[in-house]
């Protein structure tokens, strides 16, 4: 018997262009695409983006863009929101595994039962939730406008606030309004150590603590200023302080350094020595994945039309009330 040996088929790995920034710019023109990036993305992605912002700003940009393709450098619920607002546009996400611990903390079936147990309650949901949760909501909010929106609700109207309990408590403290809170949270913003922040304050007495309202109350109590990522950026720009301890995902420090390079920015430390103050989901997106998403026009984010229409109404109410 004669056995013929066959060489294994060599699958050549696709090569990246030497000038990745230039190649992305070329694809952007070719596709009539816009790149939207969250402040928590890696610096290279922020540098190639057309717009960098927080959830509210990104939603507003997605609602107003004339581009045919939206490349969303963020996490899945953000790309979903862009698709809800733009059903006829293609929405690309560099990595479909870029989820969100806060969104995942609110399963739709469980939330439906929770909502049924609190009839006659108005549902205000933080934008960090799935399309299914948005579809069950009356109004969507972001950390930029949550206080403003709650203040517009008649005082006799009971409210469910979901999914972030820490943001909900902060809004309650700011408005004096009692709300029923869904007990969800962000793994990043719950990892900051109050004890280590105090130690940093002793080492850097000139530094102001600034924090995102998704942080726990103990961390917020130590903060000189509390606000959304955009509000934190604006505060740093206006403050005379030479240094800041930043209690949010450290990706935002890239923009802080660009706007105010002479100031010192210290990421708030987590309880242990890991990099748990970095969002593992945001970090799944890379410049290379962004390039391949544009080159292949995939992976694409889609939302079933029935869910999209139900989720669109509360998002539109948010944009109107903002």
UniProtKB/Swiss-Prot annotation:
UniProt subcellular location: Cytoplasm
Keywords from the UniProt entry: 4Fe-4S, Cytoplasm, Iron, Iron-sulfur, Metal-binding, Pyridine nucleotide biosynthesis, Transferase
Pathway: Cofactor biosynthesis; NAD(+) biosynthesis; quinolinate from iminoaspartate: step 1/1
Catalytic activity line of the entry: iminosuccinate + dihydroxyacetone phosphate = quinolinate + phosphate + 2 H2O + H(+)
SUPFAM superfamilies: NadA-like
The keyword Magnesium is annotated on this UniProt entry: no
Enzyme superclass (EC): transferase
GO BP term, example: 'de novo' NAD biosynthetic process from L-aspartate
InterPro entries: NadA, NadA_sf, Quinolinate_synth_type2
Sample GO molecular function, one term: 4 iron, 4 sulfur cluster binding
EC number of the protein: 2.5.1.72
Cofactor (UniProt): [4Fe-4S] cluster
Stated role: Catalyzes the condensation of iminoaspartate with dihydroxyacetone phosphate to form quinolinate.
HAMAP family, A to Z: NadA_type2
Family: Belongs to the quinolinate synthase family. Type 2 subfamily.
Protein name: Quinolinate synthase
Source species: Cyanothece sp. (strain PCC 7425 / ATCC 29141)
Gene encoding the protein: nadA
